[in-house]
Amino acid sequence: MSQSTNVTELARANVRALTPYMSARRLGGNGDVWLNANEYPLATEYQLTAQTFNRYPECQPKLVIERYAAYAGLATDQVLVSRGADEGIELLIRAFCEPAQDAILFCPPTYGMYAVSAETFGVELRTVPTKADWQLDLPAIKASLDRVKLIYICSPNNPTGNLINPADLRAVLELAQGRAIVAIDEAYIEFCPQASVSSWLKDYPNLVILRTLSKAFALAGLRCGFTLANSDIIQLLLKVIAPYPLSTPVADIAAQALSPLGLEQMRQRVSEVTANRAWLQNALQECACVEQVFTSESNYLLARFTASSSVFKTLWDQGIILRDQNKQPSLSNCLRITIGTRQECERVIAALAPLPGVDSPNSTNTASLRKETI
C-alpha cells in the first residue's frame, strides 16, 4: 500500500459510507430553552456514596440490578444494565446478527439509532413504514421477514408519541416466533406505565424490552439503560457486553434513583410533565401557525406547522431549540417539542402566537385542523 494512501481507506466500506446519528448535542445551537432531546428540564441532585475509585466496578452492579428488577417486577436474571438503551440496541445486533447476511426490521418514522447501529455492523436494514395512523402494517411486516433476525418497535414511538396497539405487538411476536427477536423500546414507558409489555416475557421467549433512566428519571447525562429479557437472552448479551459498562459513580447514582425515594420523585416528575404536556397541547391548538397537534403518551409533542422551517428558525433565533422532523417519512412540516417547565412551555407559545398561518390550497381548513388531535 502506498504511503500516500488516505488512512480512511483502511476503514470498512460500510463505516466510510455511514451517516452518524445526529443527536441533539451534535446539531448544536446556542439556546437557553432546550426542547430538542426529550430530556427532563431540571437537574436532579445526588451525592456520591461510593468512594472506591481505584478498583474496577462490577460488570453488572448488584444493587442496581436488584432494584431495577424489583421496579420492573422481574427476576434479577432477566435484567441487564448498560450504557444507555442505545448500547442495548447494539448488543442485540452483536449477539444475533451475522454481518452481510442477516437483517433488522423497523417501522419509520421512528428512532434513528436502530438504523445507525445496524449499518455500523454491516447488517441490512429492512424498513416497513407505519400506516397513516402510525400503527404497524402487519401484512407488510409478515412479507418482509426473510433473513430478519431483529425487529425493533418503539412504543410510545419516538418521534410521533403514540402507543403501538398491543394486539399488533402480540401479532408481531407470533410472526417472529422461532425466527427473530422482537425488541420493544420502552424508553418513555414511565409516562404510560400501564402500556408496558414486561409481563409478556413469561409468554414470549423472543421478546426483549429496552428501558432507560434518561427520560422520566431525569438522568440523560448518566448514560444508564436496561435490557429486559428471559435469562437465556441475558446470558448471550453478557458475552458481548464490555467488561465494565457502568462506572462506579454511575452505578451509585442509578441505585439511588431506583430507591423508594427515587421512584417517588420520578413519579412526581411524570405527573408534572403530563400536566405541562396537556397545557402545551391546548395552547398549541390556538396558534395560527399550527395545523395539527398529535396526541402523545410521552414527554414530547409532535406538531405539524403551516411552515415548519420558518417556525423552527424563528424559535431558534429566540433561543428556543426544537427538533425538526421533516426528513422522517410522513412528517413533512412537523416539529417535535420536548415538554419543558411551564415557563419554557409559555415561552414557546409566546414565540408562536404572533406567527401567521398560511392561506393556500394546501392548507385549507387549517382552522378546523388546529382543533384536532390524533
UniProtKB/Swiss-Prot annotation:
Keyword list, A-Z: Amino-acid biosynthesis, Aminotransferase, Histidine biosynthesis, Pyridoxal phosphate, Transferase
Cofactor(s) demanded: pyridoxal 5'-phosphate
Cross-referenced Gene3D superfamilies: Aspartate Aminotransferase, domain 1 (3.90.1150.10), Type I PLP-dependent aspartate aminotransferase-like (Major domain) (3.40.640.10)
Disulfide-linked positions: none
Keyword flag Ion transport: no
Xref: PROSITE patterns: AA_TRANSFER_CLASS_2 (PS00599)
Domain of life where this protein originates: Bacteria
InterPro entries the UniProt entry points to: Aminotrans_II_pyridoxalP_BS (IPR001917), Aminotransferase_I/II_large (IPR004839), HisP_aminotrans (IPR005861), PyrdxlP-dep_Trfase (IPR015424), PyrdxlP-dep_Trfase_major (IPR015421), PyrdxlP-dep_Trfase_small (IPR015422)
Biological processes, Gene Ontology terms: L-histidine biosynthetic process
Pathway: Amino-acid biosynthesis; L-histidine biosynthesis; L-histidine from 5-phospho-alpha-D-ribose 1-diphosphate: step 7/9
Residue numbers of N6-(pyridoxal phosphate)lysine PTMs: K215
EC number: 2.6.1.9
GO molecular function terms noted in the UniProt entry: histidinol-phosphate transaminase activity; pyridoxal phosphate binding
Keyword Amino-acid biosynthesis annotated: yes
Catalyzed reaction equations: L-histidinol phosphate + 2-oxoglutarate = 3-(imidazol-4-yl)-2-oxopropyl phosphate + L-glutamate
Subunit annotation: Homodimer.
Family named by the database record: Belongs to the class-II pyridoxal-phosphate-dependent aminotransferase family. Histidinol-phosphate aminotransferase subfamily.
NCBIfam families per UniProt: hisC
Designated name of the protein: Histidinol-phosphate aminotransferase
